[in-house]
Curated annotation (Swiss-Prot):
The chain crosses the membrane at residues 188-210. Component of complex II composed of eight subunits in plants: four classical SDH subunits SDH1, SDH2, SDH3 and SDH4 (a flavoprotein (FP), an iron-sulfur protein (IP), and a cytochrome b composed of a large and a small subunit.), as well as four subunits unknown in mitochondria from bacteria and heterotrophic eukaryotes. It comes from Oryza sativa subsp. japonica (Rice). The keyword Calcium does not apply. GO terms for biological process: mitochondrial electron transport, succinate to ubiquinone; tricarboxylic acid cycle. This is Succinate dehydrogenase subunit 4, mitochondrial. Residues 1-36 form a transit peptide. GO terms for molecular function: metal ion binding. One of its GO terms (cellular component) is mitochondrial inner membrane. Its main location: mitochondrion. InterPro entries: SDH4. Heme binds at H166. It is a single-pass membrane protein. A ubiquinone binds at Y179.
Length: 211
């Protein structure tokens, strides 16, 4: 503490002597006040090295001026924190606005866009077809024993025949998928096999006079 006071008094005396020598007269008071206000409060802190300049922001992988960060988004399921790249850009306007223009921050989050807008493509439609086929196969699987027990008319017996042929078709379809690898050949095999089963089911219904 004493060393700080001694250093400050020496600096003040030196400033006073310089002000008296350089600006005599009424202007000396003003110059003295300016010199006094420019003195550092802590001479030890003034002697310390200046802080290192701030490092620039990390650039994005695409080489654009973007800053990585996180932003909270509120949804029905709860609050989610999504990673974002915040790109900075100068606002457009008149020449007066461009001189003192501020940098705007625009948020970019591919993950949020994929959550908000589900993608629709060939894979989505194919998965929907697979789900429909699985549901139909499971339904006919449970319909066969049920109709065997409660079938009392031609309509229920026709449904029973259709369920049995559908199960036969799905069984052979799995076998053909394993052994027929060419797409076009597999497609036509399925078509003709389905036609064959439809004809057999029709002949069965007609033969037993179910309609």
């Amino acid at each position: 503490m004493a060393s700080r006071l001694l250093a400050r008094s020496k600096a003040l005396a030196l400033a006073l002597s310089r002000a008296d020598a350089a600006a005599p007269g009424p202007a000396a008071g003003v110059q003295w006040l300016r010199t006094l206000s420019s003195l550092p409060r802590d001479p030890a802190a003034a002697a310390s090295p200046a802080p290192a300049p701030r490092q620039p922001a990390v650039g994005s992988p695409l080489g654009l001026s973007k800053i990585p960060g996180y932003e909270q988004t509120s949804r029905l399921s709860g609050t989610q924190v999504l990673p974002r790249w915040f790109s900075t850009g100068t606002s457009n306007g008149s020449s007066a606005q461009q001189e003192g223009a501020t940098r705007k921050v625009m948020a970019f989050s591919p993950l949020e866009a994929s959550i908000a807008k589900p993608r629709k493509g060939p894979l989505t439609s194919e998965s929907w077809k697979v789900k429909q086929t699985e549901l139909l196969t499971r339904s006919t699987y449970y319909m066969i024993p049920t109709l065997l027990l409660v079938s009392k008319n031609s309509i229920s017996t026709s449904l029973l025949v259709a369920s049995v042929f559908h199960q036969v078709y799905m069984f052979y379809k799995e076998i053909l998928l394993d052994y027929v690898h060419h797409d076009i050949t597999r497609k036509w095999v399925f078509i003709y096999f389905k036609i064959l089963l439809i004809i057999m089911a029709k002949e069965t219904v007609v033969y037993f006079d179910l309609f």
